[in-house]
């Protein structure tokens, strides 16, 4: 997966609600490693499924983004979670 492409896609599609790995809609369910682990989302497979199909307040992006793009976003999210969202 291409995390550089994932970063650009994240900025364009996800950062409105998830800036800096946070969550402006549900503050408990951030993209930080601890929250991803707590909610069983700390895997590319889980992130890809949620981004593709949406859940709750989060819209589905499977219509707007190609599978490869969603994989790149998931790789970027996991990379950032591992690095504490410092970049």
UniProtKB/Swiss-Prot annotation:
UniProt organism field: Aphanizomenon flos-aquae
Gene3D superfamilies: Cytochrome c-like domain (1.10.760.10)
A single GO BP: photosynthesis
Highest taxon above the source species: Bacteria
Function per UniProt: Functions as an electron carrier between membrane-bound cytochrome b6-f and photosystem I in oxygenic photosynthesis.
Gene, per the UniProt record: petJ
This protein's name: Cytochrome c6
Record bears the keyword Manganese: no
Binding site for heme c: 14, 17-18, 58
Record carries keyword Thylakoid: yes
Main location: other
Keywords associated with the record: Electron transport, Heme, Iron, Metal-binding, Photosynthesis, Thylakoid, Transport
């Amino acid at each position: 997966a291409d995390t550089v492409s994932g970063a650009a896609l994240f900025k364009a599609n996800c950062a409105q609600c998830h800036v800096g790995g946070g969550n402006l809609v549900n503050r408990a369910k951030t993209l930080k490693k601890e929250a991803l682990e707590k909610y069983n989302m700390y895997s590319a497979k889980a992130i890809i499924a949620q981004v593709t199909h949406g859940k709750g307040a989060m819209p589905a992006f499977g219509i707007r983004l190609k599978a490869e793009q969603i994989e790149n976003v998931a790789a970027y999210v996991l990379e950032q979670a591992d690095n504490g969202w410092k970049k």
